UniProtKB/Swiss-Prot annotation:
UniProt: NADP(+) binding residues: 10-34
GO molecular function terms listed in the Swiss-Prot or TrEMBL record: oxidoreductase activity
Keywords: Oxidoreductase
Binding-site list for substrate: S140
Organism annotation: Staphylococcus aureus (strain MRSA252)
Record's protein name: Uncharacterized oxidoreductase SAR2567
Domain of life of the source: Bacteria
Keyword 4Fe-4S: no
Length: 231
């Protein structure tokens, strides 16, 4: 028997990159997976590689709380419960304050911060009612290490880390777990234009394995934070 048999998982940002790798691994380990993201075609491409009776595609814009609420409801209606929510949707755009790209700042704040909060708001009532569940937020090393071109992005990922820390304290002794995972540079379409040629990258699968590690600890153990760096 696989380790997540019949667990019900929602993964945002599941159409590509880290989210796709997480969704695929959870499905391989027996979970029923709801794939969420903006691009329906990309989500469907991922779903087509998985067993159709244990996957559901729900196009979702995480910056719209009504859509996130509907995503969580759809997961429960389709599979009869909610055990795992992975906040993997993220955005990395121009981040220098002195570039004055306010629209891009707003977009990152909406996706990276508000999206994380909206998903927690939608999922936690069910998890608290059943005294179980696991919320995992994908943050970033950039939340701790700021470069001259990453200021706004780093600030949003630092916020994701802080949100997770606060939730860990709020949810203590409730049976609901929360984890923050902070990867270094990961080889995805998003990072392709940002990465210096001499900088090592992680693979999306590496982050998926970190998620699985957090999810498969004993019931009395909560992994609060994981940092993943390339060697």
């Amino acid at each position: 028997m696989t380790v997540l048999t019949d667990k019900i998982a929602v993964v945002t940002g599941a159409g590509s990159g880290i989210g796709e790798a997480i969704a695929t691994l959870l499905h391989e380990e027996g979970a029923k997976v709801v794939l969420a993201g903006r691009n329906k075609d990309k989500l469907q491409n991922v779903a087509n590689q998985l067993a159709q009776d244990s996957v559901k595609v729900v196009p979702t814009d995480v910056t719209k709380k009504e859509e996130v609420d509907e995503l969580i409801k759809m997961a429960q209606q389709t599979f009869g419960g909610l055990d795992i929510v992975i906040n993997s949707a993220g955005q990395m755009l121009s981040s220098k304050i002195t570039d004055y790209q306010v629209d891009e700042w707003d977009s990152m704040i909406d996706v990276n911060i508000k999206g994380t909060l909206y998903t927690a708001k939608a999922a936690l009532p069910t998890m608290l009612e059943q005294s179980s569940g696991h919320l995992i937020n994908i943050a970033s090393i950039s939340g701790f290490e700021v470069t001259k071109s990453s200021t706004i992005y780093s600030a949003t990922k630092a916020a994701v880390h802080t949100i997770t820390q606060g939730l860990e304290k709020e949810l203590a002794k409730t049976g609901v777990k929360v984890t923050s995972i902070s990867p270094g540079m990961v080889d995805t379409a998003i990072t392709a234009t940002y990465n210096p040629t001499d900088r090592k990258k992680l693979e999306p699968q590496d982050i998926a394995e970190a998620v699985l590690y957090a999810l498969t600890q004993p019931k009395h153990v909560n992994v609060n934070e994981i940092t993943v760096r390339p060697v």
